[in-house]
């Protein structure tokens, strides 16, 4: 044997921090371009910018109002768009500190009748320019503070406060763009989104040789604008106020700061001689292409030929929404067509594609962001506005090219119009055939409820329809009816190649179905059992 020392073999590899590389979550600082921060990591600078941008001093003074030694607003909800949600935590902290509001997590379970409370509303990414009354009612709010750009449409129930913010602009660059685009002989309207409106007078002052008309913000009856004083009077149009009695907008060129959404842009392009948009971030201008109005004329004809109309309700907070909804329902019924009402939240192609029996959609939404303008034929069925639908349902289709989205204007034009119907059942077969002007095909289902009072579907085998029959769809000599009324959905189901599980059986299903019972009612916060 040798005297050498035996070294035990290493059972593991020596490891240190440099042996392996671990993936780490990268911390990305929020840009907050709207605040123009020089040092994004400085908390004091961020707080100071937020105070100035949102005019928090005036907001706190408004929220601290009292009536009879008690707070006027106790349940306050804050609504933020997606691009401003990064400031929500700081704003809530400042409001709680200045108003002496105890955070909700530190309060007792019992609700106080004198204390103020603050909530941040969630899920308002679609049509964020409107006040979300439905979300505010979940906490029984008595005031909604809306931050960011707003459509400023009249709201229905709640009191609201608009905090638009005070963004900055390169005024000299905008003045240079206006001088390049227009001559002194042209009439120009200066317009922007709501947050940039306070800068328009400053821009107009630097253009003394031009005929400039400023689009100011309107005064709303149930809302206050923080940091801005709207003019008391003026000509109101496009949710703006013009300092004149009457305006012929067709003779004016529009220079719009920021690029509006498609519904707003289509509304403006149909009323002005030309439209030029300015992007304040890139500093570039654009003169098109913009949404096409001729496509809307095609949809009006398709609405005239449609047999089933889906009414898509995108907002319930705007004034006159319920009145317009009831008016549309009556007009559809007078025209002999069927309708269904849908509330699907944020619409998309997949949601609307589930309802194949709907021939055309009528959308009730905000004229700024709540109307779907399908420019690339993404949706399977056409989507029209209430004005376009009522225009298509009228007896004589005559369109001047104007595009109306204001609820009040639509009601004034079509609210009292009566659609004529032929009440003589004997002359129904003598009516001229209906052809689709778009495709040229014969349309037999454009008025499925025509003369509903005289509709009789009989069977030679049974001699009529049994009121106690529980079968959903009856086929009588090539007709499809539900309890004696023609069903467009049943006709659509009958014409499909595959109608669901069990459709390959020829015998009738005689089994008794389950009884329908009342379920829970209310919202997720508290159901009524």
Swiss-Prot record:
Gene Ontology molecular function: 2-(3-amino-3-carboxypropyl)histidine synthase activity; 4 iron, 4 sulfur cluster binding; metal ion binding
Binding site for [4Fe-4S] cluster: 130, 151, 366
GO biological process, one term: protein histidyl modification to diphthamide
InterPro entries documented for this protein: DHP2, DPH1/DPH2, DPH1/DPH2_1, DPH1/DPH2_3
Disulfide-linked positions: none
Keywords: Cytoplasm, Iron, Iron-sulfur, Metal-binding
Pathway in which this enzyme or protein is active: Protein modification; peptidyl-diphthamide biosynthesis
GO cellular component: 2-(3-amino-3-carboxypropyl)histidine synthase complex; cytoplasm
Bound cofactor: record note: Binds 1 [4Fe-4S] cluster per subunit. The cluster facilitates the reduction of the catalytic iron-sulfur cluster in the DPH1 subunit.
Subcellular location: Cytoplasm
Needed cofactors: [4Fe-4S] cluster
Pfam families: Diphthamide_syn (PF01866)
Highest taxon, organism lineage: Eukaryota
Subunit structure: Component of the 2-(3-amino-3-carboxypropyl)histidine synthase complex composed of DPH1, DPH2, DPH3 and a NADH-dependent reductase, predominantly CBR1.
Task of the protein: Required for the first step of diphthamide biosynthesis, a post-translational modification of histidine which occurs in elongation factor 2. DPH1 and DPH2 transfer a 3-amino-3-carboxypropyl (ACP) group from S-adenosyl-L-methionine (SAM) to a histidine residue, the reaction is assisted by a reduction system comprising DPH3 and a NADH-dependent reductase, predominantly CBR1. Facilitates the reduction of the catalytic iron-sulfur cluster found in the DPH1 subunit.
Similarity comment: Belongs to the DPH1/DPH2 family. DPH2 subfamily.
The protein's name: 2-(3-amino-3-carboxypropyl)histidine synthase subunit 2-1
Species this chain originates from: Candida albicans (strain SC5314 / ATCC MYA-2876) (Yeast)
Protein's gene: DPH2
């Amino acid at each position: 044997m040798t005297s050498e020392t035996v070294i035990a073999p290493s059972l593991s590899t020596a490891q240190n921090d440099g042996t392996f590389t671990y993936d780490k979550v990268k911390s990305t600082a929020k840009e907050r371009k709207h605040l123009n921060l020089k040092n994004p990591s400085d908390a004091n600078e961020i707080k100071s910018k937020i105070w100035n941008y949102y005019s928090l001093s005036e907001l706190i003074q408004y929220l601290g109002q009292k009536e009879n030694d008690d707070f006027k607003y106790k349940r306050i909800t804050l609504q933020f768009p997606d691009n401003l949600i990064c400031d929500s935590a700081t704003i809530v902290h400042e409001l709680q500190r200045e108003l002496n509001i105890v955070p909700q997590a530190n309060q007792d379970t019992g609700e106080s009748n004198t204390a103020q409370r603050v909530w941040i509303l969630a899920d308002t990414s679609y049509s964020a320019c409107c006040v979300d009354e439905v979300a505010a009612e979940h906490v029984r709010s008595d005031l909604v503070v809306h931050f960011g750009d707003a459509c400023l449409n009249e709201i229905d129930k709640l009191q609201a406060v608009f905090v638009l913010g005070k963004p900055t602009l390169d005024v000299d660059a905008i003045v240079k763009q206006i001088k390049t685009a227009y001559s002194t002989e042209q009439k120009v309207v200066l317009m922007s989104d709501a947050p940039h409106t306070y800068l328009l007078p400053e821009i107009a002052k630097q253009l003394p040789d031009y005929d400039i008309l400023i689009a100011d913000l309107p005064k709303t009856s149930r809302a206050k604008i923080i940091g801005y004083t709207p003019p008391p009077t003026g000509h109101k149009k496009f949710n703006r106020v013009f300092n004149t009695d009457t305006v012929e907008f067709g003779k004016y060129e529009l220079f719009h700061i920021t690029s509006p959404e498609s519904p707003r842009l289509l509304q403006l392009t149909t009323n002005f001689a030309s439209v030029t948009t300015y992007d304040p971030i890139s500093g570039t201008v654009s003169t098109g292409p913009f949404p096409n109005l001729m496509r809307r004329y095609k949809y009006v004809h398709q609405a005239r030929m449609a047999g089933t109309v889906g009414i898509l309700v995108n907002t319930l907070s705007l004034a006159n929404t319920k009145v317009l909804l009831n008016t549309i329902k009556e007009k559809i019924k007078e025209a002999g067509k069927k309708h269904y009402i849908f509330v699907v939240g944020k619409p998309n192609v997949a949601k609307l594609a589930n309802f194949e029996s709907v021939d055309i959609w009528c959308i009730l939404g905000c004229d700024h962001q709540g109307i779907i303008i399908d420019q690339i034929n993404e949706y399977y069925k056409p989507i029209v506005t209430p004005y376009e639908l009522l225009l298509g349902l009228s007896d004589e289709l005559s369109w001047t090219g104007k595009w109306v989205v204001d609820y009040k204007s639509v009601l004034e034009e079509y609210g009292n119009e009566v659609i004529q119907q032929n009440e003589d059942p004997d002359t129904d077969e003598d009516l001229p055939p209906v052809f689709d002007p778009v495709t040229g095909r014969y349309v037999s289902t454009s008025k499925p409820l025509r003369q509903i009072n005289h509709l009789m579907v009989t069977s030679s085998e049974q001699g009529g329809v049994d009121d106690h029959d529980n079968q959903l769809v009856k086929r009588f000599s090539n007709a499809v009816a539900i309890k004696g009324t023609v069903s467009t959905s049943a006709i659509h189901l009958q014409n499909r190649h595959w109608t669901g599980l069990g459709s390959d059986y020829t015998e009738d299903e005689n089994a008794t179905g389950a009884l329908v019972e009342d379920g829970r009612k209310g919202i997720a916060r508290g159901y009524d059992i």
